[in-house]
Amino acid sequence: MPKRILQGTVTSDKNEQTVTVLVERRFKHPLLKKTVRLSKKYRAHDPENQFKVGDVVRIEECAPISKTKRWKVVTEAVTA
């Protein structure tokens, strides 16, 4: 099964080797036919502490690293 890759914004970098990433997704509601925005926070592994608040990053699913971390930061997303 392929690993999921998501893109989001770093909202917290206060923990050692961990960042909190806010991932927002949009979809059309099946009944209301309206675009709905949902967001979810993921805790991701950042071994070098290189990402700061406000950075747009890509995170990849991985084996559990701790109680709450199941994602790792792959790269900083290119914003054009």
Swiss-Prot record:
Q: Which InterPro entries is this protein grouped with? A: NA-bd_OB-fold, Ribosomal_uS17, Ribosomal_uS17_bact/chlr
Pfam family membership, one:
Ribosomal_S17
- What's an example GO BP annotation here? translation
Which GO molecular function entries does the Swiss-Prot or TrEMBL record give?
rRNA binding; structural constituent of ribosome
Q: Which domain of life is it from?
A: Bacteria
Tell me which Gene3D superfamilies the record gives: Nucleic acid-binding proteins
One cellular component GO annotation, for this chain's record? cytosolic small ribosomal subunit
Keyword entries, A-Z: Ribonucleoprotein, Ribosomal protein, RNA-binding, rRNA-binding
Function comment: One of the primary rRNA binding proteins, it binds specifically to the 5'-end of 16S ribosomal RNA.
The family annotation for this protein states: Belongs to the universal ribosomal protein uS17 family.
| Record's subunit section | Part of the 30S ribosomal subunit.
Q: What HAMAP family does its record include?
A: Ribosomal_uS17_B
| Descriptive protein name | Small ribosomal subunit protein uS17
Q: Name its species.
A: Cereibacter sphaeroides (strain ATCC 17025 / ATH 2.4.3) (Rhodobacter sphaeroides)
